[in-house]
Amino acid sequence: MSRRKTIEKRPVTPDPRFNSVLVAKFTNGLMERGKKSLAQRIFYDAMDLVADRMKDEEPLTVFEEAMEKVRPRVEVKSRRVGGATYQVPMEIRQARRNALAIRWIISYAKSRSGKCMSEKLASEVMDAFNNRGAAVKKRDDTHRMAEANKAFAHYRW
């Protein structure tokens, strides 16, 4: 048995505008070089653009539904068995689902062509909300890989 103490997770304080922990985690993922106020401004500008373009929807619900549509349920992990490496499908815990969805939305928003980051982020969130976009495609590819390797699910540990 390990003698190390389990580290308590630090609570994430909700963001000031939407009072949401998910938004706070997203802005933390968006932040570069410790510039949190800039990351928050980019996110809030993106949500204002979402509110302008989708008048019938609340921007926070659009963001939350987009996150839900990007979150993967299963992924494959490499496992060595007798000299061969198998891609074993595994279920993902909730915290990792959120982290992957945040990472994918931000990275594919950055790789989009556009003027500023808030516009790129807004269009990526709206595409994810409508089940389009690169982040949703990445989730589908991850699920397809897990489905293709379902035969190796008994190697799960």
From Swiss-Prot:
Keywords assigned: Ribonucleoprotein, Ribosomal protein, RNA-binding, rRNA-binding, tRNA-binding
SUPFAM superfamilies associated with the record: Ribosomal protein S7
Keyword DNA damage applies: no
A Pfam family that the UniProt record links to this protein: Ribosomal_S7
Function comment: One of the primary rRNA binding proteins, it binds directly to 16S rRNA where it nucleates assembly of the head domain of the 30S subunit. Is located at the subunit interface close to the decoding center, probably blocks exit of the E-site tRNA.
An individual GO BP term: translation
Lineage: Bacteria, Pseudomonadati, Thermodesulfobacteriota, Desulfobulbia, Desulfobulbales
Subunit relationships: Part of the 30S ribosomal subunit. Contacts proteins S9 and S11.
InterPro entries: Ribosomal_uS7 (IPR000235), Ribosomal_uS7_bac/org-type (IPR005717), Ribosomal_uS7_CS (IPR020606), Ribosomal_uS7_dom (IPR023798), Ribosomal_uS7_dom_sf (IPR036823)
Gene3D superfamilies linked: Ribosomal protein S7 domain
Origin species: Desulfotalea psychrophila (strain LSv54 / DSM 12343)
Gene Ontology terms for molecular function: rRNA binding; structural constituent of ribosome; tRNA binding
Top-rank lineage group of the source organism: Bacteria
Cellular component terms per the entry's GO annotation: small ribosomal subunit
Disulfide bonds: none
Similarity remark: Belongs to the universal ribosomal protein uS7 family.
Protein name: Small ribosomal subunit protein uS7
The keyword Metal-binding belongs to this UniProt entry's keyword annotation: no
